[in-house]
From Swiss-Prot:
InterPro entries from the UniProt entry: Ribosomal_bL12, Ribosomal_bL12_C, Ribosomal_bL12_C/ClpS-like, Ribosomal_bL12_oligo, Ribosomal_bL12_oligo_N_sf
Protein name (Swiss-Prot/TrEMBL): Large ribosomal subunit protein bL12
One GO BP annotation of this record: translation
Summary of the function given for this chain in its UniProt record: Forms part of the ribosomal stalk which helps the ribosome interact with GTP-bound translation factors. Is thus essential for accurate translation.
HAMAP family: Ribosomal_bL12 (MF_00368)
Cross-referenced PANTHER family: 39S RIBOSOMAL PROTEIN L12, LARGE RIBOSOMAL SUBUNIT PROTEIN BL12M
Annotated source species: Desulforapulum autotrophicum (strain ATCC 43914 / DSM 3382 / VKM B-1955 / HRM2) (Desulfobacterium autotrophicum)
Gene Ontology terms, MF aspect: mRNA binding; structural constituent of ribosome
Cellular compartments per GO CC: cytosolic large ribosomal subunit
NCBIfam families (alphabetical): L12
Similarity field: Belongs to the bacterial ribosomal protein bL12 family.
């Protein structure tokens, strides 16, 4: 291998786009037969085991759009802002309610999104 230092590698990675980084991670996972998500799952499972089985608390929540209500356009705008979906996709999500808007998020974020959607006139639940 040439004279490539760790600093050179870090600098190279720092200049990559998000798409390039994603592709790099996938290639590294394939080359070494590992998954970047595995350590996170193991740490979460380990943390739950340390806390004990007595009080098992839900850590991931789903925000479900139950109904759009009377202010459908406002709800579509909020769904677009929250999810980053295009107009067509956001309208389809609102039309097909009940549908999840966001899944697997922390409670604080779920409550914030619920409040945003309710302010726009939607009926929302957090599960």
């Amino acid at each position: 291998m040439a004279d490539v230092t760790k600093d050179d590698v870090v600098e190279f990675i720092a200049n990559m786009s998000v798409l390039e980084l994603s592709e790099l991670v996938k290639e590294l996972e394939e080359k070494f037969g590992v998954s970047a998500a595995a350590p996170v799952a193991m740490m979460a499972a380990g943390g739950a085991a340390d806390a004990g089985a007595a009080a098992e608390e839900q850590t991931e929540f789903d925000v479900i759009l139950e109904a759009a209500g009377d202010k459908k356009i406002g709800v579509i705008k909020e769904v677009r802002a929250i999810t980053g979906l295009g107009l067509k996709e956001a309208k389809a999500l609102v039309d097909e309610a009940p549908k999840p808007v966001k899944e697997g998020i922390v409670k604080e974020e779920a409550e914030k999104i619920k409040a945003q959607l309710e302010a726009a006139g939607a009926q929302v639940s957090v599960k």
